[in-house]
Amino acid sequence: MSSIDKTMKFNFSEEPFDQDIKEILMTVHESLQEKGYNPINQIVGYLLSGDPAYIPRYNDARNLIRKVERDEVIEELVKFYLEQNRETK
Protein backbone atom coordinates (compact mmCIF):
# COMPACT_ATOMS: atom_id res chain seq x y z
CA MET A 1 0.00 0.00 0.00
CA SER A 2 1.50 3.31 -1.03
CA SER A 3 1.62 6.28 1.31
CA ILE A 4 -1.04 7.98 -0.83
CA ASP A 5 -3.53 5.25 0.17
CA LYS A 6 -2.89 5.55 3.90
CA THR A 7 -4.94 7.76 6.17
CA MET A 8 -2.84 10.46 7.75
CA LYS A 9 -3.42 11.33 11.40
CA PHE A 10 -3.52 15.03 12.19
CA ASN A 11 -2.77 15.95 15.80
CA PHE A 12 -3.32 19.32 17.37
CA SER A 13 -1.43 20.15 20.50
CA GLU A 14 -3.65 20.72 23.52
CA GLU A 15 -3.06 24.43 23.89
CA PRO A 16 -5.25 26.67 26.05
CA PHE A 17 -6.35 28.87 23.13
CA ASP A 18 -10.05 27.98 23.23
CA GLN A 19 -11.11 31.13 25.07
CA ASP A 20 -8.73 33.34 23.07
CA ILE A 21 -10.12 32.04 19.79
CA LYS A 22 -13.67 32.58 20.99
CA GLU A 23 -12.93 36.16 22.06
CA ILE A 24 -11.11 36.90 18.80
CA LEU A 25 -13.95 35.49 16.68
CA MET A 26 -16.54 37.47 18.63
CA THR A 27 -14.55 40.70 18.26
CA VAL A 28 -14.03 40.09 14.53
CA HIS A 29 -17.73 39.26 14.12
CA GLU A 30 -18.78 42.47 15.88
CA SER A 31 -16.35 44.55 13.82
CA LEU A 32 -17.66 43.08 10.58
CA GLN A 33 -21.26 43.75 11.62
CA GLU A 34 -20.46 47.33 12.60
CA LYS A 35 -18.89 47.92 9.19
CA GLY A 36 -21.95 46.49 7.42
CA TYR A 37 -20.45 43.22 6.17
CA ASN A 38 -21.96 39.74 6.39
CA PRO A 39 -19.70 38.37 9.17
CA ILE A 40 -20.15 34.69 8.30
CA ASN A 41 -19.29 35.18 4.63
CA GLN A 42 -16.24 37.30 5.46
CA ILE A 43 -14.89 34.92 8.12
CA VAL A 44 -15.41 31.90 5.85
CA GLY A 45 -13.67 33.75 3.02
CA TYR A 46 -10.70 34.43 5.27
CA LEU A 47 -10.54 30.87 6.62
CA LEU A 48 -10.68 29.33 3.14
CA SER A 49 -8.29 31.70 1.39
CA GLY A 50 -6.01 33.00 4.12
CA ASP A 51 -6.42 36.47 2.63
CA PRO A 52 -6.64 38.96 5.51
CA ALA A 53 -8.38 41.47 3.22
CA TYR A 54 -11.65 39.73 4.15
CA ILE A 55 -11.28 41.14 7.67
CA PRO A 56 -11.31 44.91 8.26
CA ARG A 57 -8.67 46.78 10.20
CA TYR A 58 -11.53 48.31 12.20
CA ASN A 59 -11.15 47.62 15.96
CA ASP A 60 -7.85 45.87 15.12
CA ALA A 61 -9.87 42.86 13.90
CA ARG A 62 -7.41 41.96 11.13
CA ASN A 63 -4.45 41.84 13.50
CA LEU A 64 -6.44 39.87 16.07
CA ILE A 65 -7.53 37.13 13.66
CA ARG A 66 -3.97 36.77 12.39
CA LYS A 67 -2.74 35.99 15.92
CA VAL A 68 -4.15 32.47 15.64
CA GLU A 69 -3.60 29.95 12.89
CA ARG A 70 -6.54 29.34 10.59
CA ASP A 71 -6.45 25.59 11.31
CA GLU A 72 -6.81 26.34 15.04
CA VAL A 73 -9.90 28.44 14.35
CA ILE A 74 -11.37 25.70 12.17
CA GLU A 75 -10.61 23.11 14.85
CA GLU A 76 -12.47 25.15 17.47
CA LEU A 77 -15.44 25.71 15.16
CA VAL A 78 -15.70 21.98 14.38
CA LYS A 79 -15.38 21.00 18.06
CA PHE A 80 -18.04 23.52 19.07
CA TYR A 81 -20.40 22.39 16.31
CA LEU A 82 -20.03 18.72 17.20
CA GLU A 83 -20.44 19.35 20.94
CA GLN A 84 -23.57 21.43 20.35
CA ASN A 85 -25.13 18.90 18.01
CA ARG A 86 -24.18 15.73 19.86
CA GLU A 87 -27.16 16.21 22.18
CA THR A 88 -29.68 16.61 19.34
CA LYS A 89 -29.10 13.10 17.92
From Swiss-Prot:
Belongs to the UPF0297 family. This is UPF0297 protein OB2008.
